[in-house]
Amino acid sequence: MGLMWGLFSVIIASAAQLSLGFAASHLPPMTHLWDFIAALLAFGLDARILLLGLLGYLLSVFCWYKTLHKLALSKAYALLSMSYVLVWIASMILPGWEGTFSLKALLGVACIMSGLMLIFLPTTKQRY
């Protein structure tokens, strides 16, 4: 059950990260504070996506809290690295994100996935 909550947390946090990235690239920069505030108060699509991203992070924290009650921290913390993989893949697949493929990034993803497999593979007890 802890693994399920952890996966929910990772998926929701990844979606929230993508939402915040979209909103940040479409809203006025915060250096133009009044324009930024006006865009938020207009509550257009960009502001709603920003709000969804923030609410997504809040929901992700709730799922993470449930994860930590059911799963060892050493395993739970490793799950967070999956978010990097999901966001990287989504940025290349989703239109308008302009995520780029590189062999270095692929190698990094392979390292992350290998590490997760090492952590989550069942261990066998050795007999002496």
Curated annotation (Swiss-Prot):
Transport in keyword set: yes
Membrane topology: Multi-pass membrane protein
Ranges facing Periplasmic side: 24-35, 98-100
GO biological process, one term: lipopolysaccharide biosynthetic process
Gene3D superfamilies: 1.10.3730.20
Cellular compartments annotated: Cell inner membrane
GO MF annotations in UniProt: carbohydrate derivative transmembrane transporter activity
SUPFAM superfamilies: Multidrug resistance efflux transporter EmrE
Ranges in the topological domain labelled Cytoplasmic: 1-2, 57-76, 122-128
GO cellular component: a single term: plasma membrane
InterPro entries, per the entry: Flippase_ArnF, Small_drug/metabolite_transptr
Pathway: Bacterial outer membrane biogenesis; lipopolysaccharide biosynthesis
Keywords assigned: Cell inner membrane, Cell membrane, Lipid A biosynthesis, Lipid biosynthesis, Lipid metabolism, Lipopolysaccharide biosynthesis, Membrane, Transmembrane, Transmembrane helix, Transport
Transmembrane regions: 3-23, 36-56, 77-97, 101-121
Record text on subunit structure and interactions: Heterodimer of ArnE and ArnF.
Family: Belongs to the ArnF family.
Entry-linked NCBIfam families: PRK02971.1-2 (NF002816)
Protein role: Translocates 4-amino-4-deoxy-L-arabinose-phosphoundecaprenol (alpha-L-Ara4N-phosphoundecaprenol) from the cytoplasmic to the periplasmic side of the inner membrane.
The protein's name in its UniProt record: Probable 4-amino-4-deoxy-L-arabinose-phosphoundecaprenol flippase subunit ArnF
Organism: Escherichia coli O17:K52:H18 (strain UMN026 / ExPEC)
Gene that this polypeptide is encoded by: arnF
